[in-house]
Amino acid sequence: MRSLTGMPRLVALVALSAFAGPSAWADTLADKLTPHVGETIDLVELGTGRRFVRPVLAGVVEKNDAVTGLRLRAEGQKTVTTVSLSGIAKIVADRETVHEAETTGRAFAQLRGRRGREAYDRQAEASAARMKANGVEPWPQLTAEEHAAEVTSLKAFVTEIRQKFPGLAVSETHEFLVASDVPPAQLAPFVANLDSMHDFLCELYGMPTGEPLWKGKCLVIAFLNEADYVAFEEGVLKSGMQGTQGVCHQRSDGRVIMVCHRGADPAAFAHMLVHETCHGFNHRWMTPQRLPNWLNEGIAEWVGTRVVKNCEQVPLKEARAAAFMRSKGTLGPGFFTAANIEPMQYGMASGMVRMLISRDARKFAEFVRGIKEGTPVEESLQRSFGGSLDDLVKAYGAAVGVPNLSTTDE
């Protein structure tokens, strides 16, 4: 679902009685919303199923001491739109659902929106049943208080590391907490790519935008200089990352910390930010189940090309990978099984992901979802696309001009 950026005011004034009108809960709703006036809230979903994602709550409209509507400024917009409370299905602020209406109306648009939500709920129930059958536990559903506590903990961690790296300045988006010594004017467009990546993956996987995904927020620590990046990794997180530009730390408790340095190429920096945080998103989506490395890297590379339009890294990697495959006739060692694929294989991984998504994005989401539910990779591929890994290699080989492409090194 997309946010309502640029939606005409007339469309936003949903006055049809799809939901129960203002009543006793409207009084308490005012108490819950008033502290957020002037701030960005998570979500306002209309009865039609359309959504304001990360809007600014410009004001609360009241009549006879009851809430009758909201004044919202859609993300990235300057104008304020008034939305009737009778047409609102759900309001989420500070990770807390502060309003969820009971459906009563019969108008076609509202029924369509309700059916969409019911279909998503049925999918979630079926997914939960498959997880249970596979012995897989989903990530815990956190309360608003638990999300807030995690953000507080992350900020305390940043305060601690600023004692060693005092140049780090702290900023926030709705989904990300950012600590960086990169000049703010230089950093801003790159940080904007992070929220774009978040929304893009929500749409790819069929996850409603505006719903909580991270544990609190994803922490991004971006250094200007490589030496500080290496010193932080070795001295604070006790990991050796010499020779890399960024890394995504994905903890078993759900916390995600992405650390990087700017480097000399702005487009490469932008792509790397998206690539690494994409790994964090995949870690947090649904369950802790790990994706195979070729798929995880392929998704991260492909998403980077969609979010960072001016980055030529991935097409160049795919071209080099194609030349390698034409020369060797193989994907190289352990492509489907390696814990970490070889640098040459990144272009193969992104090429396979791009091919699968271009064939059917919905089936691709089902394929990834199946793995996160605990289904073995090849079984999930068979269920979604009707083929095996060997079939995938044959199709990909044909696409890159290597009809006899092999997975072996022979």
Question: Where is each model-derived feature located?
Answer:
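Short, isolated positions in well-ordered beta-strands
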Residues: 52, 81, 177-178, 389
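Acidic/His/Gly-enriched intrinsically disordered linker/tail segments
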Residues: 239-256, 268, 272, 287-410
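Bacterial N-terminal signal peptides
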Residues: 9-21
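N-terminal secretory signal peptides that target proteins for export/translocation
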Residues: 1-7
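Compositionally biased alpha-helical segments
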Residues: 25-166
